């Protein structure tokens, strides 16, 4: 019997990660292989050199195949970059049935109506995510199926991205010998791996801070209402250290990883030092770790202040009742939660990927949130599509079962 595999490929600026998961007979997900490689040909989340990226992608997938013992044929791939944007839209349809009872087809029609927005020729729709429905003027409805009405409105969040970026990504994976099932927004995948349903319902600001970009999703009442990208990531911190302390970038990166902290308040002693190794004829130098923390804190604070300004501009700042969750490589800075709480005045936590069968401790790390989120996202989608097929058969004999309606409510919305 063939294995039911789900494969996610996270194409980041610092690393490429492939996750292979198997769906067992109990419909549970189990991680069977993870392969990583150094990312080349990718800048700020966008492919800039297909040949270089092709090698990195191939190496990551081959490593995952070797560990899992599987032959990968197709996969879902993450996309990020400053071209990604989110917008909210509304659609309206009339309920045409004699009974005025709203069914799945009506929901699909209103979502299609909401999707009918004008987007530039160089952009494409990545995701359309329902937020709420309004039946005859009654708002805040999550699942309108089986309700009575004559007018159905649907509000959705539409995420778009650069067509050329998406096409180049797909082309690169195809050239490596693999089919692409879907292009998924990387931060959306990460949120699947790290956020609880309660946080999404309460309203949570989700931040995925990578090497090249910082991606944001603001969830309200369980759905995204704002998606944005700040084209600055933790690599900018490395460049700041290199510039201020006049060291090569690789030395600055090592200093950042081994001694960097995001908030001076967590220093055990103000006298702590950092040793800069000898460079050519220049002897080793001793620098203040507090000075290092100030360099890092300044850049990270700037990024978070930019985020805060965007959310304030949209009038959504008072909706973050569930706090702030940070994941990605930027979440590894000690003290970064302190800084976020200082800037936003909301509680903050580090978002670790949820535990999945087969996952090793070394992969329960913010750096792997997007890759693991891809397989979780596709698994939920797979379960939903399976139940929709069952639902179609059930409807021919009866109304949609309460079990299916509950699934519809829980997983789609």
Swiss-Prot record:
Keywords attached to this entry: Cell cycle, Cell division, Cell inner membrane, Cell membrane, Membrane
Annotated SUPFAM superfamilies: Actin-like ATPase domain (SSF53067)
Cellular location(s): Cell inner membrane
InterPro entries cross-referenced by the UniProt entry: ATPase_NBD, Cell_div_FtsA, FtsA/MreB, SHS2_FtsA
UniProt GO cellular component terms: cell division site; cytoplasmic side of plasma membrane
Membrane topology: Peripheral membrane protein
Family annotation (Pfam families): FtsA, SHS2_FTSA
Protein's GO biological process: FtsZ-dependent cytokinesis
Record CDD domains: ASKHA_NBD_FtsA (cd24048)
Function, as annotated: Cell division protein that is involved in the assembly of the Z ring. May serve as a membrane anchor for the Z ring.
Protein family per UniProt: Belongs to the FtsA/MreB family.
Subunit structure: Self-interacts. Interacts with FtsZ.
Name used for this protein in its record: Cell division protein FtsA
Protein's organism: Borreliella burgdorferi (strain ATCC 35210 / DSM 4680 / CIP 102532 / B31)
């Amino acid at each position: 019997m063939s294995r039911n595999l789900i494969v996610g490929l996270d194409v980041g600026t610092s690393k490429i990660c492939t996750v292979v998961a198997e769906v067992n007979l109990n419909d549970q997900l189990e991680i069977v292989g993870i392969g990583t490689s150094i990312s080349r040909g990718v800048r700020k989340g966008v492919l800039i050199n297909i040949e270089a990226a092709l090698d990195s992608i191939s190496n990551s997938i081959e490593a995952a195949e070797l560990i899992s013992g599987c032959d990968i044929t197709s996969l879902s791939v993450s996309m990020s970059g400053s071209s990604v944007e989110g917008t909210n839209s509304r659609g309206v349809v009339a309920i045409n049935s004699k009974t005025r009872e709203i069914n799945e087809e009506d929901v699909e029609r209103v979502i299609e109506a909401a999707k009918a927005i004008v987007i530039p020729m160089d952009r494409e729709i990545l995701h359309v995510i329902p937020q709420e429905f309004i039946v005859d003027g009654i708002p805040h409805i999550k699942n309108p199926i089986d309700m009575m009405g004559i007018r159905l409105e649907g509000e959705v969040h539409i995420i778009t991205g650069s067509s050329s970026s998406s096409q180049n990504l797909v082309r690169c994976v195809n050239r490596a010998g693999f089919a692409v099932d879907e292009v998924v927004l990387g931060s959306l995948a990460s949120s699947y791996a790290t956020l609880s349903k309660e946080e999404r319902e309460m309203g949570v600001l989700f931040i995925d801070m990578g090497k090249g970009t910082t991606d944001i999703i603001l969830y309200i009442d369980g759905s995204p209402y704002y998606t944005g990208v700040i084209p600055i990531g933790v690599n900018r911190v490395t460049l700041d250290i290199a510039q201020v302390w006049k060291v090569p970038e690789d030395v600055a990166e090592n200093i950042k990883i081994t001694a960097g902290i995001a908030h001076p308040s967590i220093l055990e002693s103000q006298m702590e030092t950092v040793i800069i190794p000898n460079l050519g004829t220049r002897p080793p130098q001793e620098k203040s770790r507090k000075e290092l923390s100030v360099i890092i804190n300044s850049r990270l604070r700037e990024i978070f202040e930019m985020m805060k300004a965007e959310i304030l501009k949209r009038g959504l700042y008072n909706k973050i009742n569930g706090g702030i969750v940070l994941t990605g490589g930027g979440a590894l800075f000690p003290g970064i939660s302190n800084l976020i709480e200082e800037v936003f005045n909301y509680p903050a936590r580090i978002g670790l990927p949820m535990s999945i069968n087969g996952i090793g401790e070394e992969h329960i790390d913010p750096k792997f949130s997007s890759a693991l989120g891809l397989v979780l996202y596709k698994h939920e989608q797979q379960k939903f599509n399976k139940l929709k097929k069952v639902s179609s058969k059930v409807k021919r004999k009866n109304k949609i079962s309460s079990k299916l309606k509950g699934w519809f409510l829980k997983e789609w919305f």
